[in-house]
Amino acid sequence: MVNSIRKAIVLIFIAAGFMTLSAQTGKGLLVGKVMSETGRVLVGAKLFVTGSQDSGVTDVEGKFSFAVPVGARKVFVEAAGYDVLEDSVMIELDKEFFLNPVMSTISRMEGVEIVKRKKPKENTVAAAIQTKQLSSGMVEAISAEDFAKTTIRTTSDAIKRIPGATISEGKFANIRGMFDRYNAGYLNGAPLPSTESDRKAFSFDVIPAALLDNIVVVKSATPDMIGDFGGGIIQINTKSVPEKFIQTASIGFQYNSITTFNTMDAFGLEGSEYLGLPSAKRNIPVLDPKMGFEPHTTSKDPALNARETLKFNNDWSLKKVNVMPAPRFSYSLGMPFKLGKKEAGLLVSWNYAISPRRSEGNIVSKDYSTNYTYKDFSDEILSTNVQNGGVVNLSVKLNKKNRIDFRNLLSLTYDAGSTLRSGLTDADNGMYSEGFSNQVNFNRLVSSQVNGLHSFGKDKSKLTWVLNYGNTYRAVPDFRIANYALPEGDIANRQLVLNAFFNAGTGRFFSYMNETNVSASTDYSYNADLGKTHHVFKTGVFAQNRVRDFQSRQFVYAPVGGFKPSSALPEQDLGASAISASNIYLIEKRSEERRVGKECA
């Protein structure tokens, strides 16, 4: 009996010991805000707590929050240029302890030698925070570290994550609610050429995020900026040359439950299209200038038109496309080396991704007051995006105060889409329709720059300069549409629509836009202390030259102005075997004035 009582007492003490140990090993939360004596929030201040391996770092608002073991603890706060602050706290289990340290500036430093000042890497969150802190204007920044935490694939995806910036049409940036034409885009400090034929805008989906270090959005004007914007400036910076040898490679596959391993009818990709380059089959052949054209509805020489039509790629066949998981590859190599006695570095980075996407939609136009339906048709779409690009950057440090960078970027973006449409398109006339379309958009961006950075005196004066060459090429090669009409939905009366309107009939469209931008800029800044205040004086010069060329050609199938009975698919109705002077042929849709101008040239 006595032994049993002793055992029970021992077990009680052991249990109490475990309970005490459990309570001591629990954690509470230490939260607060670090500020200076002048009321300035301190970004990047570090907090250390005795008895804990955890530490905290303040964010862009000077705030911190991290878990700390319970009990009496000492907190040490460190910030560059300020005395180390020590304070005592009592942390309770699962409770918050608020601490708002106020830091005092270092008034005197004796016997201190600064061995090395380390700058945050440009692709880190710390560098993005520092950019925002040190800027004289209102800026937001996002870094490659942020890219890795999300599903960001393109520059437009990254811009969506920045406060005050939105993306329209999946690629154009709106800053502070202002449309793309009022904003400016810069790549490594040089202006980006426009990718649009009818407006000043850049399509940000053509640059893969894997090739970038960071993106900075400037939302307010400062005297040292070029005044060609109203909303903001988007500054894109490609990967910089590393200080030590690095080599990274990644491979991944994307699965989509709606798309992957599903089979659908589509025009598909072939050959070089998998690399992001248009197939040569999509080019416009060299045509006889006597080929018929608008406003005539028929050719003066149908036999000639038929022969010219046979020069095109007349393969309209649909293929059974089985969508496989989407692959993604990336590779980066960075290495420092000696160029004579000069320090130099090289960075080579390549990114490739292909992303198919299947979607279905239903479009209904209805008067709900009378319950009358004007239109009711469905679309089945298979779109494929191919991104292929890379950067090659070289940096040469002439000495401690002079550096020259060579930055080069090539980006290829290829979007191919197949759309199959069916349903009611005109209720007033009882017209049902079937449509087949194949559209491709190709974008190529080439950017080459030489940048210089020079410091003078005790780093009070800085001179930077940029020589830039940029080129964008955008093409819509062989956009095809075939439309069929079914009066009252009767399949027996199915007809191929032939009219003078490409988008409402049957035809082909080609367009090419090429813009070259050459620019040069130089900026000078001088730092001066006047009394107790610090001032920065800046001045600069900028010049650029833009040259743009745009061409488009539209073809419709003739004889124009009627319907051709058909129960077949486009591959039979518009294939090479169907082309003849007595059956069907292409006619170029152009104005009479343009025709005369070309004949006289």
Set out the residue ranges of the language-model regions.
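Periplasmic N-terminal accessory/gating domains of Gram-negative outer-membrane beta-barrel systems
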Residues: K119-E122, A126-N174, G189-P223, G230-I233
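N-terminal, post-signal-peptide soluble/periplasmic segments
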Residues: I129, D224-D315, K319-P325, K342-G345
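Transmembrane beta-barrel wall of Gram-negative outer-membrane proteins
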Residues: T298, L310-T419, V446-S448
